[in-house]
């Protein structure tokens, strides 16, 4: 659940599939055994199929969690927070000299890459590091945040500046592909581009004016840069105190081999 982000931005992930109540998934993990669903005669086949899909989801997820536990993979689930923030907090407080590989299809996580942290992007089937981010993603990892602050994120329904997508962003600020830029520099360069066109008796580009005037189709209004930064910036994870304690507890907890073997794993997946 991403309640902490919904509180900042009500339209967060509003474009996602509404058929499932994702918050209910987390609540039902521990009492998964309550499988029985009562079907009333007046339910449509669509409703029945949806309930079957939900039941299958819970069953498969429960099996996956048991397999991971058997393989010594520690798991954390907390209300109101998202996996990205748990990962970011762990990376921020990792053990000295610990090397981390994050496996995800979410390229937002490349914000976290460092000399000892890389992201295996599942769609690309590549390990993304500070050295190859430009080659595989197209621009320096240092600008993942600023690009999304300006352009938004379609997958999470985060609106950006009107008329400024990724292509336009890099056309306006080509240096952003290879070196870190700040919001102040984006605003300064936008104003410079506006002034240059006016000197040539040309109408300023709407995209640069929108950047200066903070024009967006989203509900963020004039606070768009501040709100988008809080939603997207993984250097400051949005976590509850309970979630922080949960991560702290597992970081140095010893592995418990008692009762684990491949026979158990085989019986789980049968």
Residue ranges of predicted features:
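Extended two-metal-dependent nuclease catalytic cores across DNA- and RNA-processing enzymes
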Residues: 15-269
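Extended, highly charged clamp/arch subdomains and adjacent linkers
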Residues: 1-14
């Amino acid at each position: 659940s991403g309640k902490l982000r919904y509180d900042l931005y009500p339209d967060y992930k509003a474009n996602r599939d509404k058929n499932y109540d994702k918050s209910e998934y987390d609540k039902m993990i521990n009492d998964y055994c309550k499988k029985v669903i009562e079907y009333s005669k007046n339910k449509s086949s669509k409703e029945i199929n949806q309930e079957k899909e939900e039941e299958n989801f819970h069953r498969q997820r429960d099996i996956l969690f048991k397999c991971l536990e058997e393989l010594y993979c520690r798991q954390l689930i907390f209300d109101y927070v998202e996996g990205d923030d748990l990962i970011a907090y762990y990376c921020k407080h990792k053990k000295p000299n610990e090397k981390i590989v994050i496996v995800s299809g979410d390229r937002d996580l490349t914000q976290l890459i460092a000399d000892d942290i890389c992201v295996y992007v599942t769609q690309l089937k590549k390990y993304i590091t500070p050295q190859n981010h430009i080659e595989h993603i197209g621009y320096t990892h240092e600008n993942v945040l600023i690009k999304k602050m300006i352009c938004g994120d379609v997958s999470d329904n985060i609106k950006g500046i009107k008329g400024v997508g990724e292509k336009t962003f890099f056309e306006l600020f080509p240096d952003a592909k290879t070196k870190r830029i700040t919001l102040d520099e984006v605003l300064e360069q936008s104003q410079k581009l506006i002034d240059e066109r006016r000197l040539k008796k040309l109408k300023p580009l709407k995209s640069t004016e929108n950047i200066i005037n903070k024009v967006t189709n989203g509900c963020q209004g004039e606070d768009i840069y501040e709100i988008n930064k809080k939603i997207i910036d993984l250097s400051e994870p949005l976590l509850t105190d309970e979630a922080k304690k949960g991560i702290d507890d597992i970081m140095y907890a010893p592995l418990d081999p008692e009762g684990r073997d491949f026979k158990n794993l085989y019986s789980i997946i049968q």
